C-alpha cells in the first residue's frame, strides 16, 4: 500500500492505514485529546535507508551545508504524554491513536523521573517519553504469574503496556515501571534551539533522560554508532529496538514539517531482529480427523 501511494499520491486519504498512528484507546479509561499530535516514525533498516533520509532532508531544504543529527537509543516501550499547566502536572496519557489517548495519570504518579511540578516552566508544556519495564522486573513478574497459574507476558513491552493500563492501583504499585523522556509537544515556548539542548533542559528540570545519545553528522557516523550500540545491546537493563535519528536543529524541524503520521526530520533506525538457538527435545504426534 505504501508503494502504491508513493506512486499515486492523489490516492492517499486521511483514513488510509498508512496515515494512522497506534490504536484506539481502551474503553475502560477516560479519553484525553493531545494538544499536539503524537506522531509515529518512519523506519530505516540499513545505511542506504539513512542516506536516502538525509538526501530527502537536503532536497526539502535545498541545502548542501553541514547537518547535525542527534541519535538517541530507542527503548522498546509505551509512548506517553505529560501535560503541565503553569508548571504543575495535570494529566498523563498514552499515545493511543496519536490524537487521543488513555488517561493513565494515577498509574504514573509513582514513577521516578516524572516531576509533579516544574520551576520556570512555560504556561503549558507537553513532555513526551517512553514507559518500560527492565528485563529483571519482567522476569520477576512472569515468575510470579507462573506461580499463580496466570498467563505469562510475551515480552517487557507487553508487560509494561498491561501494567500501565491496569485498573488495580495495587498491582501497578508492585511493578516497577520506569520512564525516559525525549521531547516536547512544541519547543517554541522554550529557549533551546537544538534537540541536544532540549534533552539537557528536560534533565535539568527533573525528567529522566537516557544518557545513551550522541551527535552525529552523516550516515557513516550513524552506522559506526549503531554498530557500537548493537554490541552493547545485550548488556542493557531494558529492551532496545534501535535508535531514533533526529535533525538536531529545532527550527529545521518546523521547516521540514511532517506527513499526517510522521515527522520528516526524524527516523527510527531499527536493529536487526535478535537471533537465538533452540533445541527441539521431543515431538508428540497426533492424528486428526
Q: What are these model-predicted stretches?
A:
Residues 1-119, 139, 158, 164, ...:
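Phosphate/adenylate-binding "loop-and-lid" substructures adjacent to NTP/NAD/dNTP-binding pockets
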Residues 64-66, 74-76, 124, 229, ...:
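Short solvent-exposed loop/turn micro-motifs enriched in small/polar/acidic residues
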Residues 64-68, 122-124, 174, 233, ...:
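Short secondary-structure junction motifs
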Residues 110-126, 203, 208:
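Flexible helix-coil linker/hinge segments at domain or subdomain boundaries
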Residues 130, 135-289:
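Long, charge-dense accessory insertions within large macromolecular proteins
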Amino acid at each position: 500500500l505504501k508503494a502504491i501511494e508513493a506512486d499515486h499520491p492523489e490516492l492517499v486519504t486521511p483514513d488510509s492505514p498508512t496515515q494512522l498512528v497506534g490504536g484506539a484507546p481502551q474503553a475502560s479509561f477516560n479519553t484525553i485529546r493531545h494538544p499536539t499530535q503524537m506522531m509515529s516514525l518512519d523506519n530505516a533498516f540499513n545505511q542506504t535507508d539513512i542516506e536516502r533520509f538525509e538526501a530527502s532532508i537536503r532536497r526539502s531544504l535545498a541545502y548542501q551545508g553541514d547537518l547535525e543529527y542527534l541519535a538517541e537509543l530507542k527503548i522498546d516501550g509505551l509512548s506517553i504524554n505529560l501535560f503541565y499547566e503553569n508548571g504543575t502536572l495535570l494529566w498523563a496519557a498514552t499515545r493511543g491513536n496519536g490524537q487521543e489517548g488513555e488517561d493513565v495519570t494515577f498509574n504514573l504518579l509513582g514513577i521516578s523521573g516524572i516531576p509533579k511540578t516544574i520551576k520556570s516552566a512555560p504556561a503549558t508544556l507537553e513532555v513526551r517519553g517512553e514507559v518500560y519495564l527492565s528485563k529483571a522486573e519482567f522476569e520477576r513478574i512472569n515468575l510470579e504469574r507462573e506461580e499463580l497459574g496466570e498467563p505469562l507476558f510475551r515480552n517487557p513491552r507487553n508487560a509494561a503496556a498491561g501494567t500501565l493500563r491496569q485498573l488495580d492501583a495495587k498491582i501497578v504499585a508492585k511493578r516497577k515501571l520506569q520512564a525516559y523522556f525525549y521531547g516536547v509537544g512544541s519547543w517554541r515556548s522554550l529557549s533551546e534551539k537544538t534537540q541536544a539542548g532540549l534533552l539537557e533542559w528536560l534533565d535539568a528540570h527533573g525528567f529522566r533522560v537516557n544518557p545513551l545519545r550522541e551527535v552525529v553528522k552523516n550516515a557513516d557516523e550513524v552506522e559506526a554508532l549503531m554498530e557500537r550500540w548493537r554490541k552493547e545491546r545485550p548488556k542493557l537493563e531494558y529492551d532496545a529496538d534501535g535508535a531514533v535519528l533526529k535533525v538536531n536543529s529545532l527550527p529545521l524541524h518546523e521547516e521540514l514539517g511532517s506527513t499526517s503520521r510522521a515527522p520528516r526530520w526524524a527516523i527510527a533506525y531499527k536493529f536487526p531482529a535478535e537471533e537465538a538457538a533452540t533445541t527441539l527435545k521431543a515431538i508428540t504426534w497426533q492424528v486428526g480427523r
